[in-house]
């Protein structure tokens, strides 16, 4: 594959390798010292992070979750720290914080518990099989207190069956496959292979992605703060290597019980998972609706191999660690009317064309699917349909195509306190005509497309709010994306580590979306290690980026109080596509009270007609010039077609493309000075740190 020689990840590796060697030496020294004195040393202090940064840097932003997250690169290990690196198609780029720990047989990584815990989640990667489809391999879990093991050792059986996609959209599980779309432009050869002679060849597997999966484990007892969780790769296992990215630890509450309810067991649901429970759940739902009861599903693993259609009912589980719905992806005998060729476990409202569903409340259970490939016509999502006047809370969704996909028109849905991980595509999508709905306190990790999206295709979404959510490590597209719509809000979210063909926060007039109208407010969001490299354009994006493709973006768009930390390339980007550069514009976006802490290149990159205003936008650790202004590339009258308005208070300095030394990051470039350099040298910024107001 072709990689940018300017990419900061490439230059960091040598430094990180040296640092890792020193760290491993120190670990070995500590172990030797403990043996020499004949007594155990105290455990290493727990390092708790959020999105792999100090929690103080993102306080008040993102989801409040019951677990504490620890990065493996901050733990004690006899393995090797890999990364940091941000090049797509690499294991380290998809890791939280862009670093992880690689273990081989006999090696371990140890995490000191920061609080009492009885459950853990391990995010990991192991190799695929040579022909695709994954392998399984063990990972031993033990707990050490004052140098001695306590409790029972446990073994996790890791799998890569739900990891690894390859090639071009819509991707494949086959690492040996030839190009899926030879008629498309391919950046690796800078050509259209089907139109090129001699035909180019490509390294296989081509464009590997989606390296990670995660697994939860109840430990059987509560361990104390300061105990050490040791993850060890046993001597014999199928995996040549095991990469551990992070460990979440939490104290899970006892199962919830509902006595005055329609208990699913009484209708034949099987908590052992041996028999399909779908029909039993239908019976329980019918009984509950007739008698105005909730459906209660006690602890157990329930096999469900189709959709459960819900309308006017509450489904209450014992908790997402206890009540688990799972099943196989099932091939249909003939395509369904909606184009699906598979079905699988999921809870669906009636479709809007059938009147939709109302007053549905889904609480405190897990849905673990069996989706391993992307078929965009398939309805194999965890939750779907149209759900008005409804709520979803306390769910855990894994291994479905999309966690929650809603097709409007529908109104007044609340999605709260839910975890969505390891999705083939989006975590959540409001698709067409979803109104007055809220997504709050949702934690997302490892999606294969946008984390949270509002997509106004054919019908405008309006009056919706994405608030206090965390989105980490989406392997494709954006953390949060808004495609058209009216009067929507994105507030107090935390987004980190997007990988390619998207970035942290995105506003786009594309994919056939209805126009932006009314207002769009993006307020108090934080993006960490965003501003990715766009492989097709061969340029860097912004941590937040606006893309006018189908039409202008000219609504009342305000970005207020956002923080952009450690952006690989730019903090802010406004762009159109070359083929429409003289037809579309981005007008009147207002940036206010924004902090930019570290960019590889610029604070603002403008590659479009239009303009934006800046007030109290402060920047430090800027890698190149404060502004890359290309406009629409026509450069009329010595300027560009994009105007920057300085409303004052924009502090901080950057390099200047015209003279030596530094200048105010914005003032030198106002109103439309052409400073067009899409590929300047990239300077990797320092890690985010407590804010000190810049001057200049």
Language-model features, listed with the residues they occupy:
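Extracytoplasmic
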Residues: 37-259
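Acidic Gly/Asp/Thr-rich repetitive segments characteristic of extracellular carbohydrate-active
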Residues: 264-296
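Right-handed parallel beta-helix
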Residues: 321, 358-369, 388-399, 410-425, ...
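Leucine-rich solenoid repeat scaffolds
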Residues: 606-675
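Short glycine/acidic-rich loop motifs that flank beta-strands on beta-rich extracellular proteins
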Residues: 293, 304-307, 319-320, 324-329, ...
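Extracellular beta-strand-rich solenoid/capping regions of secreted or surface-exposed proteins
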Residues: 282, 287, 302-316, 324-364, ...
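Secretory targeting and sorting signals
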Residues: 1-38
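Surface-exposed intrinsically disordered loops and tails
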Residues: 160-216, 269, 332-350, 378, ...
């Amino acid at each position: 594959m072709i990689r940018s020689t300017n990419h900061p990840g490439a230059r960091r590796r040598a430094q990180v390798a040296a640092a890792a060697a020193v760290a491993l030496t120190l670990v070995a020294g500590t172990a030797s010292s403990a043996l020499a004195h004949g007594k155990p040393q105290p455990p290493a202090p727990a390092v708790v992070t959020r999105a792999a940064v100090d929690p103080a840097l993102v306080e008040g932003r993102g989801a409040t979750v019951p677990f504490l997250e620890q990065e493996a690169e901050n733990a004690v290990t006899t393995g090797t720290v890999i990364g940091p690196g941000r090049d797509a198609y690499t294991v380290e780029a998809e890791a939280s914080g862009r670093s992880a720990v690689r273990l081989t047989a006999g090696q371990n990584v140890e995490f000191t518990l920061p609080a009492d815990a009885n459950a853990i989640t391990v995010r990991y990667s192991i190799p695929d099989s040579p022909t695709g489809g994954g392998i399984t391999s063990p990972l031993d879990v033990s707990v050490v207190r004052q140098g001695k093991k306590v409790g029972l050792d446990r073994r996790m059986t890791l799998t890569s069956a739900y990891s690894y996609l390859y090639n071009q959209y819509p991707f494949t599980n086959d690492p040996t496959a030839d190009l899926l779309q030879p008629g498309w432009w391919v950046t690796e050869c800078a050509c259209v292979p089907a139109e090129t002679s001699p035909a180019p060849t490509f390294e296989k597997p081509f464009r590997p992605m989606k390296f990670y999966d995660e697994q939860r484990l109840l430990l059987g007892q509560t361990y104390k703060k300061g105990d050490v969780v040791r993850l060890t790769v046993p001597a014999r296992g199928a995996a040549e290597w095991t990469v551990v990215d992070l460990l979440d630890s939490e104290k899970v509450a006892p199962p919830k019980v509902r006595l005055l309810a329609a208990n699913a067991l009484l209708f034949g649901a099987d908590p052992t998972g041996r028999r399909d429970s779908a029909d039993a759940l239908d019976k329980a739902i019918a009984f509950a609706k007739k008698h105005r009861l909730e459906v209660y599903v006690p602890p157990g693993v329930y096999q469900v191999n189709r959709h459960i259609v819900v309308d006017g009912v509450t489904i209450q589980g014992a908790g997402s660690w206890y009540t688990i719905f799972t099943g196989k992806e099932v091939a249909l005998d003939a395509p369904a009317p909606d184009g699906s060729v598979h079905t699988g476990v999921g809870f669906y409202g009636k479709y809007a064309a059938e009147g939709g569903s109302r007053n549905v409340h889904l609480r405190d259970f897990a849905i673990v699917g069996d989706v391993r490939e992307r078929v965009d016509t398939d309805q194999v999502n965890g939750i779907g349909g149209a759900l008005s006047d409804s709520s979803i809370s306390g769910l855990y969704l894994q291994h479905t195509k999309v966690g929650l996909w809603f097709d409007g028109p529908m109104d007044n849905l609340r999605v709260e306190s839910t975890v969505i991980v390891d999705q083939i595509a989006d975590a959540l999508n409001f698709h067409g005509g979803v109104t007055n709905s809220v997504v709050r306190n949702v934690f997302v990790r490892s999606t294969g497309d946008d984390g949270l999206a509002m997509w106004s295709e054919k019908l405008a979404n309006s009056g919706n709010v994405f608030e206090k959510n965390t989105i980490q490590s989406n392997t494709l597209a954006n953390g949060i994306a808004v495609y058209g719509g009216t009067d929507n809000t994105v507030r107090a979210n935390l987004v980190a580590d997007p990988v390619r063909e998207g970035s942290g926060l995105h506003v786009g007039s594309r994919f056939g979306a209805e126009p932006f109208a009314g207002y769009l407010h993006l307020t108090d969001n934080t993006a960490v290690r965003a501003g990715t490299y766009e492989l097709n354009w061969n340029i860097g994006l912004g941590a937040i980026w606006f893309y006018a493709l189908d039409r202008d973006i000219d609504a009342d768009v305000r970005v207020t109080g956002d923080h952009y930390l450690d952006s690989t390339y730019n903090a802010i980007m406004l762009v159109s596509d070359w083929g429409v550069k003289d037809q579309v514009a981005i007008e009147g976006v207002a940036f206010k009270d924004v902090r930019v802490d570290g960019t590889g290149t610029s604070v603002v990159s403008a590659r479009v007609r239009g303009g934006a205003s800046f007030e109290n936008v402060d920047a430090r650790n800027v890698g190149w010039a404060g502004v890359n202004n290309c406009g629409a590339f026509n450069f009329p009258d010595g300027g560009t077609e994009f105007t920057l308005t300085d409303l004052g208070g924009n502090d901080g300095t950057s390099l200047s493309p015209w003279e030596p030394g530094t200048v105010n990051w914005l003032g030198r470039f106002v109103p439309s000075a052409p400073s067009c350099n899409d590929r300047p040298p990239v300077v990797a910024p320092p890690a985010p740190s407590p804010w000190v107001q810049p001057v200049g």
